[in-house]
A protein has these predicted regions:
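Helicase motor core with emphasis on the C-terminal RecA-like subdomain
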Residues: 1-169
């Protein structure tokens, strides 16, 4: 009879059932709150040619100078290329993905958290356990793998209760 608490930001009905089953919970109290975060603003942009999407992203970031943001991509190559294009346009950005050695990943994460860089361009390898309350925007360069991933990743914006912008290409 050891008390157990299980917490998650997002869980489908199946995941909730699995948690109850695998933790051996009997008649658990389950509390669910709304997915709605009134401080987050969602926008969908049509996917155009790569150079046009990059121009749109650069323009948006330039209009949000000094504000931290995360750009999610689906693969390492795109992450590296996009970070390089942002740097070439005068934006302090770094790439983050599982292919980097752990020391470099830690350094880049610390640079982002310490505001040495404005933007981190990342695969889904970035984010779990990251709590930077003042992320003002999350951009998805590619469609996320699932709606749950999208919600989880956009939820990194505006954790301080202030406005966050979520843009999907």
């Amino acid at each position: 009879n050891i008390p157990v608490i299980a917490l998650t930001a997002t869980a489908t009905q199946k995941v909730q059932s699995d948690i109850v089953k695998y933790l051996g919970l009997r008649n658990p109290n389950i509390f669910i709150s709304s997915f709605n975060r009134s401080n987050l603003y969602y926008e969908v942009q049509p996917k155009q040619k790569k150079d046009q999407v990059v121009k749109t992203i650069v323009k948006f970031i330039s209009q949000n100078k000094g504000k931290s943001g995360i750009i999610y991509t689906l693969n390492r190559k795109t992450t590296e290329e996009l970070a390089q294009m942002l740097v070439a346009n005068g934006i302090k950005a770094v790439a983050y993905h599982a292919g980097l050695d752990s020391k470099l990943r830690t350094l880049r994460q610390d640079q982002f958290l310490g505001e040495e860089v404005q933007v981190i361009v990342a695969t889904i390898a970035f984010g779990m356990g990251i709590d930077k309350p003042d992320v003002r925007f999350v951009i998805h360069y590619n469609m996320p793998k699932s709606i749950e991933n999208y919600y989880q990743e956009t939820g990194r914006a505006g954790r301080d209760g202030l406005e966050g912008k979520c843009i999907l290409f």
